Curated annotation (Swiss-Prot):
Mg(2+) binds at residue 26. It comes from the Bacteria. This is Shikimate kinase. Catalyzes the specific phosphorylation of the 3-hydroxyl group of shikimic acid using ATP as a cosubstrate. Pfam families: SKI (PF01202). Belongs to the shikimate kinase family. Its EC number is 2.7.1.71. The lineage of its organism: Bacteria, Bacillati, Cyanobacteriota, Cyanophyceae, Synechococcales. Substrate binds at residues 44, 68, 90, 147. One of its GO terms (molecular function) is shikimate kinase activity. The gene is aroK. It comes from Synechococcus sp. (strain JA-3-3Ab). It is found in: Cytoplasm. Pathway: Metabolic intermediate biosynthesis; chorismate biosynthesis; chorismate from D-erythrose 4-phosphate and phosphoenolpyruvate: step 5/7. Keywords: Amino-acid biosynthesis, Aromatic amino acid biosynthesis, ATP-binding, Cytoplasm, Kinase, Magnesium, Metal-binding, Nucleotide-binding, Transferase. CDD domains: SK (cd00464).
Length: 189
């Protein structure tokens, strides 16, 4: 459990979780926010609120470009606040404009192993528009290769190779954040 005085090391900086779909951003984000005693937001959930429909519907009816624009609008609004934990959509890193917002905080890449992501996705079929192809595993591999250079720009990288409880992962992420803060304290960018 993260102690309140430890959480103050962030100096009000928002934590943005980035990474592939099914890397655990939403589940871990909620746990990390609870331990840091901060509000939690999920950009995918906010996009669905703004659009009044599911992400799958947005993709089907208006296309990925429209979804990405809504995602950028949501991120722009969140970047105006401090002391948040934000789980982002897997593709948020693809737009340079989004990085200008992400740089208002500390970015943490949840670098989940490909086989772990695939196992999680198999338990939740049909909910990922970008994987609605004849070969979803190949599509996932392509997306991972395309996005990895963008994820690598994160302030902190946390490798995740096996299933762990949200509290264990939150501790792992917090330790990685603390190591980064020791090396380079935040300046409320």
């Amino acid at each position: 459990m993260i102690q309140p005085e430890e959480a103050e090391r962030l100096r009000g900086v928002t934590v943005y979780l980035i990474g592939m779909m099914a890397s655990g951003k939403s589940t871990l984000g909620a746990e990390l926010a609870a331990q840091l005693r901060r509000p939690f937001f999920d950009t995918d959930a906010l996009v669905e609120q703004v659009a009044g429909c599911s992400i799958a519907q947005i993709f089907a009816e208006q296309g990925e470009a429209h979804f990405r624009e809504l995602e950028t609008q949501v991120l722009a609004q969140l970047s105006g606040y401090t002391r948040l934990v934000v789980a982002t959509g897997g593709g948020i890193v693809l737009r340079p404009k989004n990085w200008s917002y992400l740089h208002h905080g500390l970015t943490v890449w949840l670098d989940a192993a490909p086989e772990l992501i695939w196992q999680r996705l198999k338990r939740d079929p049909g909910q990922r528009p970008l994987l609605q192809t004849p070969d979803p595993q190949a599509a996932l591999q392509r997306l991972m290769q395309e996005r990895e250079p963008f994820y690598a720009q994160a302030d902190v990288r946390v490798p995740i190779h096996s299933e762990a409880s949200p509290s264990q992962l939150a501790e792992q992420v917090w330790q990685a954040i603390c190591a980064r803060l020791r090396a380079q304290p935040p300046c409320n960018r």
